[in-house]
Amino acid sequence: MSVSMREMLEAGVHFGHQTRFWNPKMAPYIFGHRNKIHIINLEKSLPLFQQAQKFVRQLAANRGTILMVGTKRQAREILATEALRAGMPFVDQRWLGGMLTNFKTVKTSIKRLKDMKAQQEAGLDSLSKKEQLTFSREIDKLEKDIGGIQDMSALPNAIFVIDVGFHKIAVAEAKKLGIALIGVVDTNHSPEGIDYVIPGNDDSAKAVALYARGIADAIIEGRANAINEVVKAVAPESSDEFVEVDESAP
C-alpha cells in the first residue's frame, strides 16, 4: 500500500525537533521552522520513503531478510506487530551490543531459547519449585532480549531503524558489516551513512506507525509479486487454437 502526502501530514511526519538541537547535515530536508521547531519538507520525505519501500519490495521478492528495529517506548508495540505481520525479525526492547557483529554468540543464545521452549512444552514437573522459578526468569529474559530474532538464522540483508540516533550502536554494527541501512532520520541527527534516508519525525506514535506499516506492506507486496512470478513461470501456456475432434475414431 502506498503512502500519501496527506497521510504523512496527518501523522505529523513533518514536525522535527527544536531548532537549537538541529544537525546541519539535515538542512537539505528542512522546509523551514515554526515556533522554534524545524519543519521537514514532505516533498523530499515522500519520494525518499517510496525509494526505501521499492528497495524493501525488491529485497523481499528475492527472499531477503529485513531486521526491523524500534526500541523506543512509542515504537515497540507497533514495530513488533508490523514485523510479525510481514514475517520479519525484529528488536523491540533493547539492542544488545554485538547483536550483529557477534552473531555467532547470539545464535548460541537463540538455540538456548529454543531448547528451553521445547523443555517447557514437554513439562517442568521434574524441576523443583526453585528450579522452575530460575528457569522461568531465564526464559523470560531470553524472550525479551532475542525473542524477535529467534527465527533469524543468518545476518539480515538490511536493517530498518526508527531513530538512527537512539539506535546508534545498531547503525554502527550494520555499517561495519556492510548491511544496507534504511533509517528514519529526524532533524537532530545525521543522515550520513544511511543508505535509504527517511527524513521524518521519530517521536510521534502516529508517524512511527506509518513508517512501520509502509515498510511491512512493501515486504508483503514483494513476496506476493515473487510468488506471482513463479506461478506465471510454471503455469502451462494456454492455447486458443481450435482442435477438431474426430468423433468417428474408435
From Swiss-Prot:
UniProt xrefs under Pfam families: Ribosomal_S2
Any one GO molecular-function label of the UniProt entry: structural constituent of ribosome
Cellular component, GO annotation: cytosolic small ribosomal subunit
Gene Ontology BP, a term: translation
Gene3D superfamilies given in the database record: Glucose-6-phosphate isomerase like protein, domain 1 (3.40.50.10490), Helix hairpin bin (1.10.287.610)
UniProt keywords, alphabetically: Ribonucleoprotein, Ribosomal protein
Superkingdom classification of source: Bacteria
InterPro entries: Ribosomal_uS2 (IPR001865), Ribosomal_uS2_bac/mit/plastid (IPR005706), Ribosomal_uS2_CS (IPR018130), Ribosomal_uS2_flav_dom_sf (IPR023591)
Signal peptide: none
Entry's family note: Belongs to the universal ribosomal protein uS2 family.
Name listed for the protein in its UniProt record: Small ribosomal subunit protein uS2
Source organism of this protein record: Verminephrobacter eiseniae (strain EF01-2)
Gene designation per UniProt: rpsB
